[in-house]
Amino acid sequence: MSHSDAYDVVIVGGGHNGLVAAAYLARAGRSVLVLERLGHTGGAAVSTRPYPGVDARLSRYSYLVSLLPRRIVDDLGLRFAVRKRAVSSYTPDVRGGRPTGLLVDTGSTGRTRAAFARLTGSEREYESWRRFYGMTQRVAERVFPTLTEPLPTRDELRARIGDDAAWQALFERPLGEAIEAEFDDDLIRGVVLTDALIGTFAHAHDPSLRQNRCFLYHVIGGGTGDWDVPVGGMGALTDALADAARAAGA
């Protein structure tokens, strides 16, 4: 950072959003000052070394990467790596007095299909799962690119999605209605609904549709809905962002 009495832009807070803004503005030729109260940047996207004597950096708060557009990575020349998760989730259960559970294996449709069949006794729920997440995939492919475009109007986004059934299920009606219409098993309903409730005080049929908004940002990431693990923790990402901002002159 170059010292000056006047700046074109002052950014208060050195979290990931502030760092992205600083890097872009500095690259555009603006003089930029980032103010951060703490002794480090990154906000909630930071890493820690929790084990004495072990050089392992783990995420402290925010812990997965999904909503970061590839365009930002390429524009800023960010150097960091992510790894795919082999298992999306495992939900234990007891049925008929016997322990069981539901495995969602992102690397093996065969194992996931078998887990659904063992839990429910048929493949009906798995086919519903494929149908439901096929719908969210199509929505994600159309919605995610808008993150680096001017904000579309509601009508523009609806036209872009081009699927009235998906629009009603995800944008207009409480998400619980679509989940209950698609799935019969309560455990599977709960697994699907998890992405709608994380960090909210909403419920499946909340008329505010907060659960729908939460669900959407969990399923649109990267146009796939994948949530990847950053090598070196989330701090590796924000360190790369800080380096990019400094290199640009912020």
Predicted features, each with a name:
Residues 217-250:
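Helical element adjacent to the flavin cofactor pocket in flavoenzyme catalytic cores
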Residues 19, 35, 106, 169, ...:
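Conserved structured core elements
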Residues 38-41, 204-210:
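Short glycine-enriched loops at secondary-structure junctions
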Residues 97-207:
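Rossmann-like flavin
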Residues 1-3, 26-33, 236, 242-250:
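Secondary-structure transition/capping motifs at alpha-helix termini
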